[in-house]
């Protein structure tokens, strides 16, 4: 389903366990837009009735049921460079 690099997993868990994040939140992976112009989204959120909740490598992951088939096989990484830091999502 979804794969995390070790550094991405570490950064996500560090964020989710931060005291500023409300209890019960999970990593939301989703899509914005459609067809050829869709882009991936990452965020922290509570589950809704439209979500599936998974635990992947110790990370609680929320995915809207409508997005499931499009997110199979995505890989999430994290990088720090001179120009900034952040997550990348690629489809493998």
Where on the chain are the PLM-derived regions?
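C-terminal structural segments of small proteins and small subunits
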Residues: 63-92
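Short acidic-hydrophobic surface loop/beta-edge motif
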Residues: 52-56
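Short, thiol/selenol-centered motifs that function as redox-active sites or metal-ligating centers
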Residues: 2-5, 20-24, 30-46, 50
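Phosphate-interacting basic helix/loop segments used at nucleotide- and nucleic-acid interfaces
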Residues: 7-15
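Short, low-complexity, intrinsically disordered N-terminal segments
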Residues: 14-27, 57
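Residue-level signature of catalytic and energy-coupling elements of molecular machines
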Residues: 12, 58, 76
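Short linear motifs in intrinsically disordered
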Residues: 17-19, 41-45, 67-68, 77-79
């Amino acid at each position: 389903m979804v794969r995390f690099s070790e550094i991405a997993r570490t950064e996500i868990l560090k964020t989710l366990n931060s005291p500023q994040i409300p209890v019960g939140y999970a990593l939301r992976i989703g899509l914005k837009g459609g067809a050829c112009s869709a882009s991936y989204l990452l965020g922290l959120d509570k589950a809704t009735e439209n979500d599936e909740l998974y635990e992947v490598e110790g990370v609680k992951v929320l995915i809207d049921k409508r997005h499931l088939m499009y997110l199979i096989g995505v890989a999430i990484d994290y990088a720090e460079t001179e120009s900034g830091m952040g997550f990348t999502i690629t489809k493998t």
